Amino acid sequence: PYIGDQSYFDTTYKGLQLVQQELGDKVETKLIEMGTDAAGWDTAYRQAADDGYQIIISGNFQYESYMLAVAEEHPEIKFLNFDYSDAKANSLDNVYSITYAANEAGYLAGVVAGVKTESGIVGCIGGVDSPGIRQFLAGYMQGVYDVNPNAKVISGFVGGFGDPATAKEIALNMHKQGADVIYHAAGGSGNGLFEAAAEANFWAIGVDADQYASMSGKPELAKHILTSSEKKCDVAILQSIKLMLDGKAEYGTQKTLGFVDGAVGLAENENYKANMTADQLAKVEEMKKKLAAGEIKVNDQLKDDKAYDTWLDKVGLK
């Protein structure tokens, strides 16, 4: 839908670039930026359909209904919906839907926060209060608890994905309450968390992409990004397009990709390794192995709509 958020959508754009690089002899690709103004989204999808594209790639719950409306009217066009939210609505014969286990991504971030905190208080910030974002945060709280059951969590929502000023204000307030590690699942708003972390000297955890790397142009901010939970949208998009081109995509179905699939994980870059002790790194590795082996079942907000509230009641700072 657009690029420049240094997170989710930039990673998905890398997926389109991978498609062009690896499959350029079979396909021609084009990026269409729809922006953040919903007034133009329907027109953008219809224009793409009218322009004769055989496959349209789109994702994110905010855009989903617009894409599906056009998909229903154009059965001759194939659609890849990455990060779907409504399984029933995606059961169209020309739509292949994938999503990522955001609960597992959040869980891994929570494990890091739980072993890293010195104050025993950590935070998490969501972009909007939606099931998909609550899925990240509920997983985060479970991860914190599993490695540090006495830790407390402060949670809050920005109200949008393009409001770093509000995210910064929320993060600074959390830090004043004692949070020394704060995670975000807030898209472009999360840049405000990084500003707060640099200003008040605490640790931030990014989302969807290696945000330490994506913020490398601002080293004063990047050095406070301990790690990021990653949705490896780029690889998943490339794999999905290959299936579609080979006629192997299961249209009308929805596939969830998790840690065991290599679709979500942690950014274990030099900043992460330099600022975690050997014991902390070992604990994270232990929990990753348990998750991969199926020994840990992460709560799923999309299957249990009380998961976030249950965990906040259990570990929330009173």
Predicted regions and their residues:
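A residue-level marker of the well-folded mature domains of exported/periplasmic proteins
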Residues: 1-318
